[in-house]
Amino acid sequence: MNLLHLDSSILGDHSASRQLTHEVVQAYLTAHADSQVTYRDLASDALGHFSAASLAAAGTPVEVRDAAQQQEVAGNEATLQQFLDSDVLVIGAPMYNFTIPTQLKAWFDRILIAGRTFRYSEAGPEGLCGGKKVIIVSTSGGLHAGQPTGVGHEELLKALFAFIGITDLQFVRAHGLAYGEEPRASAMSAAQHYIQNELFAA
């Protein structure tokens, strides 16, 4: 199995989501020792925002692309292929201002590609990436699950993956991290217990 591990937090070593995605990957490898892991840090090795230049590069014939366009297309294709080659994804998705980090959104903009990960038919859009498993580490300073302020976070992630045919999602949650030392420790401990004892339980 090929596992793609993505972090998107901008907090480096202070990041709760990074700590937990690492623990998820280690727990997965304990259960599936023959798996191959590919790691990508979307914060330190950030993709640019999807732009008019991105569209222009993709639409320009190969033989007349300039160097910048060649680099854009090659990078986007590598990102897409990395996703397509994966069987399992572990994604760190902290909440920033009620939604996912822009670095993670830029990654989605490279993998939601008509004809590659979804297609349009007379019946509407059809996802082409079924069969993949996604584990999302969801962290937030407040408590937004089930609230209007949470729609742009976990619900958005569910919608994005469902659009390309992926419905096998599991969430590891550590919320309320900004409510003080004790609530933070409790949330992290609960998430770690879930990872070690329930996430990959048979």
Curated annotation (Swiss-Prot):
GO terms for molecular function: electron transfer activity; FMN binding; oxidoreductase activity, acting on NAD(P)H as acceptor; oxidoreductase activity, acting on NAD(P)H, quinone or similar compound as acceptor. Binds 1 FMN per subunit. FMN binds at S9, S15, A16, S17, M95, Y96, N97, F98, T139, S140, G141, G142. Gene3D superfamilies: 3.40.50.360. Keywords: Flavoprotein, FMN, NAD, Oxidoreductase. It comes from the Bacteria. It catalyses: 2 a quinone + NADH + H(+) = 2 a 1,4-benzosemiquinone + NAD(+); N,N-dimethyl-1,4-phenylenediamine + anthranilate + 2 NAD(+) = 2-(4-dimethylaminophenyl)diazenylbenzoate + 2 NADH + 2 H(+). Its cofactor is FMN. InterPro entries: Flavodoxin_fold (IPR003680), Flavoprotein-like_sf (IPR029039), FMN-dep_NADH:Q_OxRdtase_AzoR1 (IPR050104), NADH:quinone_OxRdtase_FMN_depd (IPR023048). It is an enzyme of class 1 (oxidoreductase). Its EC number is 1.6.5.-, 1.7.1.17. Pfam families: Flavodoxin_2 (PF02525). Quinone reductase that provides resistance to thiol-specific stress caused by electrophilic quinones. Also exhibits azoreductase activity. Catalyzes the reductive cleavage of the azo bond in aromatic azo compounds to the corresponding amines. Homodimer. Belongs to the azoreductase type 1 family. This is FMN-dependent NADH:quinone oxidoreductase. It comes from Pseudomonas syringae pv. syringae (strain B728a). The gene is azoR.
